[in-house]
Amino acid sequence: MSKLVVIDADVLGRHRTGDETYVENLLRRLPVLAGDEFRFAAVTRRPDLVPDGVEAVEVQARFQELRMLLGVPRALRRLRPALAHFQHSLTPRWRGPMVVTVHDLSFERTATAMGRRDRAIFKVVVPWSVGRARRVIAVSERTKRDAVELYGLDPAKVTVTPHGVDPAFARGDAGTHSYVLFVGAVQARKDPLAALAAAQENGLPLVVVGPEKEPALAAELRRRGADVRGWVEQDELAELYRGAAALVLPSRHEGFGIPVIEAMASGTPVVLSDDPALREVAGEAASYSNGSDYGRALRAALADRERLSAAGLERAGRFTWDETARRTVDVYRSVLA
């Protein structure tokens, strides 16, 4: 009889960028790749977004804390899964086997990652959650190193499972390459103002795509001339990648960097901060800045567009959601062996 795995899918429909992309793609691919060995249920506020092949279990609550303290444990008791898989923040009180994915630990490394209250909460609940998990999934070697160093985890307990890239992001009609693109949450940690300065230094406008986590920063970007779009549908995002002169991501801390592989898969050069996770993802297929010269790094990328585009396409081909799902199934097997 197949074993039931319950996946917390609270992020569905919340425009949470990388976290939501990860959960969406796991839910699509796990049922196909796991065969008859496992079956899956998603605990979520948005059952309408759960793909075919996964049981949708609706759990509503006004606050995330109440959802995890009351709603999710109640669902787990009813479903009686062999294993539960959660994101790295708050996890419920549950005695069964648990896997936790850590996307990044930026709140531990930089004060600009989130507000003071949320940062204080995360500093308590994240180590508690990963400490209770049977296995921890890290999305990059950098995130694994952070988790081991900060929380004293046994390295053997942490499995690196990189993200993938959706086939929707592919090279197509090149467009005009008349703008620079920034994709990510609008927050100080991502430093979109540096992307704007680099674009303007090179005589190009900046298009900003992503949830406006810090409204004052989004307003400042608009005041300085950026085209701030907010969250957009995947089809529109794919077109924006293909039409961009370059993606500029000056982030001060990343756990992985899904926009990097999406841009590379689209044939678009990438300009990145010299961040360990971004180096891990892009390798030599990017132009890097040390934090003070994004204008120069962008000029270099524009001048070397053909080589960076080809190198990026090759690099992005190494990252697939099927491989992410396969490695995740291997983690489930190891926990239940």
Where are these regions (language model features)?
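Carbohydrate transferase catalytic cores enriched for Leloir-type hexosyltransferases
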Residues: 1-337
